[in-house]
Structure formats: C-alpha cells, structure tokens
C-alpha cells in the first residue's frame, strides 16, 4: 500500500547518532541496526540535458573497511577514472544496487525537485531486497516510499552507503551522456556531461535545444526565429 506521506524518523529514534564524526557506518551505534540499510543519492539535478539519475546501494558491513581504505567519497570529488574504479568495486561488494531516473519530459512536467525524488523512489523500489532503512542524501524525504528513511544533508560525506550511491549514479549517468553525445555532437556533451558549460551555452544559442534538453530550464528556452 502506498503511503501519502514519507515515513521518516522525525518521531522515531534513529539507531545511529547523526552527530557522530566520520562515517556513520563506523559509528559504534551502527551495530544497533538489525537489517539492511540502503544509501540513496542522485546526480544530474543541475544539468541542462538528459535525465536526473538516482542510485540505491545496500552495502554489507564487511565492505566498510575496504571502502574506507579505498578512500571512497562524494563522487564530485573524484576523478572520472577513480569513480569508474570505485563503481566496479562497489558493484562487486554490494548486496544490491539499482538505478532509477526521471526523463527530461518528466522533469519539465513536474519540476526538477519532484523529478529528483521520483528517480530516488524508483531506484529504491527496484531493489530486490527491501531495506529496513533508507539514508537519503539532502533534506527532502522521498514521498510514497513505505520504508523508514532518514535525510542527511551532505550525506555523501557522512555515509558510505550514500557515497556509494553517489558514485554509482554518477558513473551510470556519465556513461549514458557519453553515448548520447554521438547523436548531439554540437553541444560538447562528452566534456560537460549535460551541464551548462560555456561551449554548451553557446551551442544552445546557435542550434537551439535538442529534444533531450530541459525546456523548463531558462538556458534551454531559446528561440532561433
């Protein structure tokens, strides 16, 4: 049954302290959790082109030392090659991980915030194993998600599960944009990954927006008449 409101921990005691320093998964309180925990994060929210993509990742406790040794962190702070390496490692170590996304048309129809939450919800619902708790990056709980969740601002710097989700979503989306760049070479997507670089903005002024540009974003609202 779908819930009308997100089931958050506002009135419940989270078994881990958000005031702890370092990774939450290394906190002594983590052992209080009996069940699977998923990290949820998104990428592409600020892009002008392509979908917003989310990932949900469930890591086993046995993987935490390996990922900390590998210096896992927010995907934006990693080089492309390092992200790909870590994504391969996460894919091998994870109990389960899934991708969800919202299309450009959905972004334009329901706005980028709601599309982001939709992508997150889709990624969680694709998991073959249901977690007892979702750690969600940011301050917006995912609506219509019948699973206990906790939002964490800068969660990709606080939780290994969220950092892993950030990396999986980023690598998946970058690969998609790379493939789409051959169809739309004029926008320099190979370099900017759909974000508003100078070359991208100049190309929009010259060629107009493609069908995969977000028409609800001002830089894409260009008339060539």
UniProtKB/Swiss-Prot annotation:
Reaction(s) catalysed (UniProt annotation): Endonucleolytic cleavage to 5'-phosphomonoester
BP GO annotations: DNA replication, removal of RNA primer; mismatch repair
Cofactor(s) the protein requires to work: Mn(2+); Mg(2+)
Keywords: Cytoplasm, Endonuclease, Hydrolase, Manganese, Metal-binding, Nuclease
Binding-site residues, a divalent metal cation: 41-42, 137
Function according to Swiss-Prot or TrEMBL: Endonuclease that specifically degrades the RNA of RNA-DNA hybrids.
Assigned protein family: Belongs to the RNase HII family.
Protein name per the record: Ribonuclease HII
Organism whose genome encodes this protein: Trichormus variabilis (strain ATCC 29413 / PCC 7937)
């Amino acid at each position: 049954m779908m819930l009308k409101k997100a089931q958050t921990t506002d009135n419940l005691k989270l078994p881990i302290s958000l005031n702890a320093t370092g990774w939450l998964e290394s906190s002594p309180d983590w052992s209080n959790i009996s069940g699977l925990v998923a990290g949820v994060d998104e990428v592409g929210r600020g892009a002008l082109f392509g979908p917003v993509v989310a990932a949900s990742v469930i890591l086993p406790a046995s993987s935490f030392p390996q990922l900390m040794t590998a210096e896992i962190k927010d995907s934006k702070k990693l080089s492309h090659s390092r992200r790909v390496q870590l994504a391969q490692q996460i894919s091998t170590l994870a109990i389960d991980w899934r991708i969800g996304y919202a299309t450009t048309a959905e972004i334009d129809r329901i706005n980028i915030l709601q599309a982001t939450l939709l992508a997150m919800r889709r990624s969680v619902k694709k998991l073959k194993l249901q977690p007892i708790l979702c750690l969600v990056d940011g301050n917006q709980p995912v609506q219509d998600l019948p699973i206990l969740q906790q939002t964490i601002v800068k969660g990709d710097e606080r939780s290994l599960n969220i950092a892993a989700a950030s990396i999986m979503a980023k690598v998946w989306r970058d690969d998609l944009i790379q493939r789409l760049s051959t169809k739309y070479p004029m926008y320099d997507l190979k370099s900017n990954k759909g974000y508003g670089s100078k070359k991208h903005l100049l190309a929009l002024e010259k060629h107009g927006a493609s069908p995969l540009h977000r028409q609800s974003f001002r830089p894409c609202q260009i008339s060539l008449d």
